[in-house]
Amino acid sequence: MPQRKISFYRLLPLATLLLAACSTTPPSGPATSPTSPQWRQHEQQLRQLSQFQTRGAFAYLSEKQKVYARFFWQQTAPERYRLLLTNPLGSTELELVVQPGVTQLTDNQGKRHVSNDPQEMIQKLTGMSIPLESLRQWILGLPGDTTDFTLDDKYRLKQLTYQQDGVTWVVDYQEYNTQVTPALPSRMELSQGGQRIKLKMDNWTVK
């Protein structure tokens, strides 16, 4: 039986105002070297964050659809995480639970879908292309599998470019939360072709 695509028609642009600032100019200041000891120290601190959670505003923009939602990301281990998207009324639109070897997605009708590839399942069910495997690193301010990145004047990621299977993602870090240690992204934008993903992290809890 073919999988039915999840309809996001109920996701109203409540997050539009919150995400509008995501188009602001990235942090200014002289670029710093990715080989600098300050970056290596910051990177090491980020890699030590085995458990974290963050919530905020999510927007997916493409020629075919525009999706606005609230999101909650909870990472409990390097290969275990939960992603929740809710509409402005607080109702669950999508819940993704990823564990080693198996992914379960629950849609807004309560139907469960199981796969071993979370990124492919999201694509088939929602039409959204989200690089989940890399996003687990990027959302923390880590470059993941790419070495093509630049730093800001505080030795944090400013921009990265990631290429895989002929697809190129560019991630711009527009603001950081300095109320947590180490500093973590509070605004970022991912772009690939004609699609963009905007994330605004309201708060972080780390361990």
UniProtKB/Swiss-Prot annotation:
- What range does the record give for the signal peptide? 1-21
Membrane topology according to the record: Lipid-anchor
Provide the GO biological process annotations. lipoprotein localization to outer membrane; protein transport
Q: Which GO terms describe its cellular component?
A: cell outer membrane
Lipid-modified residues, S-diacylglycerol cysteine kind: C22
Superkingdom, taxonomy of origin: Bacteria
Mention any Pfam family matching this sequence.
Answer: LolB
**Which InterPro entries does the protein's record reference?**
LolA/LolB/LppX, OM_lipoprot_LolB
Segments traversing the membrane? none
The record's subcellular locations are: Cell outer membrane
Name of the protein in its database record: Outer-membrane lipoprotein LolB
Q: What does this protein do?
A: Plays a critical role in the incorporation of lipoproteins in the outer membrane after they are released by the LolA protein.
Record's family?
Answer: Belongs to the LolB family.
Q: Where is the lipid attached (N-palmitoyl cysteine)?
A: C22
The record's keywords, sorted A to Z, are: Cell outer membrane, Chaperone, Lipoprotein, Membrane, Palmitate, Protein transport, Signal, Transport
Q: How does it assemble?
A: Monomer.
